Amino acid sequence: MKRNLLLLLMVFATLSFPLFANGTDEKNVDAANPYKGKDLVVATWGWSAGNLKKLSEDFEKKYGCNIVIDETSGNSDRLNKLIAQKNNPEIDVAILSDNFASIGIEKGLFDKIDKSVVTSYDDLYDFAKNADGYGPCYSLVRYGILYNADAVSAPTSYMDLFNGNYDGLISLPDMASTAGPYLLVSLAEDLGGSQENVTPAMELLKKEKSKIADFYMSGSSVQTGFTTGEIAVAVFMDMNVPLLRKSGLDIKWVTPKEGSFSAAATANVVKGCQNPKLAQLFIQYLISENVQNKVADVLSEAPCNSKATMSEEKAKYLASGEDAFKALKVFDLDYINSNKATWIEQFQKEIAN
């Protein structure tokens, strides 16, 4: 009897061992992957949400987490949301154009990059690195002139838009948008002014505002304007060329003689966020060579990692390589941001209304 009982206990112990072992292994797996089941909230433009989610699929698989997209549309709306949530942020990673990101940095909204985690940082082009150690640029689009070759002839400069050939068919960025202040300074320089003296440009826009069909805040209004024929020329982003061509329009890109200017997308870790380490890992993922090789195809934006490549087809309309980046018009973002509110107020009073 005792012998049978002993054998039974030995069998039970043998059968039970794998169960306990498996439980221990599962615990170890969870400990090794503390991000499993976590939601990483990434705030970006609504129009880019699907593409960013697609670009993030491998990150979700690697860490067992879920990328939740906060589709707060415009840069200004996203920045205001971050400011409102400063003491209790719901967002982990903030995607903003570089000029809006600089405002966020000034307001203390972001953590600095941990280069022991963001190990691809040194592979970025210099322009993509933040001098103070905050979030880098991971992609870039250019603003220049897009025109419908079936409707109008090619302009060569921003000033050409007011020569009478495009009356009523022009779309320009609103002053509260990313590109509005850049265009204002460019026009001021054409007219003998500067960023410190934008009066000539304000006077030009006030005089010629009847020729302008739309001052846009979102890219969707420009896309709609082209497809409906309400506009035929716009100061707009290069990334929209293939999309508009797919709609059957003969859209062409012009680099104005004043130069095209960039809007670089930055990724920052929100200070006090729920998942700071995972947010750092996500930024590393975004700027890694492997993911940067996909940026042009998935986002229709230029990658910022110097080791990244893109197809010849994409390089026809996206900035490609160091020479192309160096050719972009550069602005003093600190000066523009400190004067932007005044410019917006004047623009709304004298031009937009």
Model-derived segments and their meaning:
Residues 1-40, 352-353:
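Short, low-complexity disordered leader/linker segments with a strong preference
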Residues 100-103, 227, 233-250:
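A ligand-binding cleft/hinge motif common to bilobed small-molecule-binding domains
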Residues 45-53, 90-230:
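Extracytoplasmic ligand-binding site segments that recognize negatively charged/polar headgroups
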Residues 144-151, 186-190, 263-275, 286, ...:
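A bilobed periplasmic-binding-protein/Venus flytrap-type ligand-binding module shared by bacterial periplasmic
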